[in-house]
Amino acid sequence: MLAGSVPVDRAVRVSVTASGAATQLSALLRLVQRAQEHRPRMARAADRIASWFVLGLTAVTIATYIAWRSHDASRAFEVALALLVISCPCALALAVPAALAAAHSRLSRLGILVCRPDALETLARIDTCVFDKTGTLSDGAWHVRDVQTFGQVTTAEALCIAAALERGSQHPLASAFRAHDDGREATLASQQAGFGIAARVNGRELRLGIATFAADRADDGALWLGDGSSALARFEMEETPRPDAGPALAGLRAQGLTLHLLSGDSTDAVAHCVESLHAPFASHAARQLPQDKLARVRELQSQGHRVAMVGDGINDAPVLAGADVSIAVAGGTALAQRSADVVLLRPDLGSIAAAIDTARRTRRIIRQNLAWAVGYNLVALPLAAAGMVVPWMAALAMVLSSLTVTLNALRLARVTSS
């Protein structure tokens, strides 16, 4: 249980294992702080340009002073001073940081944490978005629709055993059995990503998962309880798509992104999700293990695509780490959030489109700022060197140049994403 969690249906007794700076929220905040301490690539490039600009300006100023000494010695100092004042390395230095600060401010108000320095820059360039299903496009609230037993246990006992097996699991399926937990002990529990969970219950090694794992049968999309070779019960599960998933996917398609769905669930469950959402997926695949998801993302990257991965679970951690930019949704596991470049703090999939929109606007404003800073200096420096600008005019122009860059960046804080 993470700090700040709210029990849904009953009181709980907890043992505190971490407090203060050791909590998951503090760990996420440290990730954000580290991201902000490391300057993005574009900011570092702007800093290098500004440093070379200062060196070049110094050389030009000295040359201008010497030239004016031989032409009109009485104005040499005034012209050199105006040249130094009107030049604006500040505009170059502010072009990127001002835009990034405004972008991060906007994203924080939307409940979006950016945990990697270059994530915004990468997010602006993505053309493909890959989604997990359970807990991402669905609400993660699974329900048991039907139970079939095979003579060894009753329906009630099968549900209680399943609840014991799932007690310590963070998988969304676990919530479907919590109401049937009668307190029986499950020991030596182990989870196999993409297959299921195993533990010793009532002195017997039992498994809960796909048919091949739990009961040595052909996979039919249901959840099976067994000992690895024979079946005790079969559960038909159902879930509800998130109400904001359809509009969010439509918004991403409107932004020009190609969408893919990779899920560890059955073919029927994936097909039902796609049909329910009327989702414009270019492809969808079921029974995907973590390594299968990662391989698919690698394949898309090898085709030249910039891939964003959206997920929430332990199974998604490897592919989140392997994507060009990764997004962990609110309520996901700690490992998924620690593996992600962007973390959604609110249960709103529309935030993904808002983040991409902000990233693209940020890139556009950075380019505008850099173009303005360069253009301003290309015009202002020759005028100052020619003696056409007095120092007070140079000071005013320099201030206005820096102010223009800052005000342009602040437009990011005012925009409203569609």
PLM feature spans:
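Membrane-embedded transport module
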Residues: 345-418
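Helix-interface capping motifs at the ends of transmembrane segments in multi-pass membrane proteins
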Residues: 51-87, 111, 276, 371-397
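Actuator/coupling domain of P-type ATPases
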Residues: 1-81, 242, 358-365
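Hydrophobic transmembrane alpha-helices
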Residues: 49, 53, 80-91, 310, ...
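P-type ATPase nucleotide-binding
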Residues: 144-257, 267, 279-297
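Conserved catalytic phosphorylation-site environment of P-type ATPases
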Residues: 6, 78, 88-165, 319, ...
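Conserved ATP-binding TGD loop and adjacent catalytic N/P-domain core of P-type ATPases
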Residues: 18, 38, 203, 227-368, ...
